[in-house]
Amino acid sequence: MSDVEFKKHRVFRETQDVIFYDISVEDSNASDLVVHEGSAVSPPDDSVGAKQFYIHYHQVDHNRVLKGERTFELVNVEWKYPYHIVHLNRSSGALIIPRGTWHRSTSGENGSIVINQAIRDDLFNHCLLYTSDAADE
């Protein structure tokens, strides 16, 4: 799994029932909070039940689970092993999803909360981010 990378957090301090984390991502210029209720799938399957995926050409994702569990499917034909299933929880660090990587995620049965500390370039267009036109980004 050498193609899959994580940005690990740094623990500043631990006290009873409290942990302080540094979750900085260098050059991040956007933060998205993604909340799944229950075992949600994003993007959802299409009308005939086929899987759908997101792909970004002007954004690198850094998806970090804040609460719950999330499983990502990643497809990148430039990797030695193009298909990966990656399970994340709070201790995993941020999953780095490079430009040009098809991806989708499924939450555990109790849902999940993820922060994506993205790095977006000047050609990023939020209007195309989550539509069927995203492949034309």
Regions of interest found by a model, annotated:
Residues M1-F53:
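A short, N-terminal "cap"/entry segment at the start of jelly-roll beta-barrel domains
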Residues Y57-F72:
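Short, conserved beta-strand element in jelly-roll/cupin
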Residues N110-L128:
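A short hydrophobic beta-strand segment most commonly corresponding to one strand
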Residues W79-I96:
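Short acidic-glycine-tyrosine-enriched beta hairpin
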Residues D46-Q52, H56-Y57, W79-P82, R99:
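Short acidic (Asp/Glu) patches
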Residues Y130-E137:
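Conserved small/polar residues in nucleotide/adenosyl-binding loops
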Residues G38-P44, S91-S92, P98-G100:
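Tight coil/turn sites that cap or link beta-strands
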Residues F72-E73, H103-G108, N116:
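Short beta-strand His + acidic residue motifs that chelate non-heme Fe in jelly-roll/DSBH
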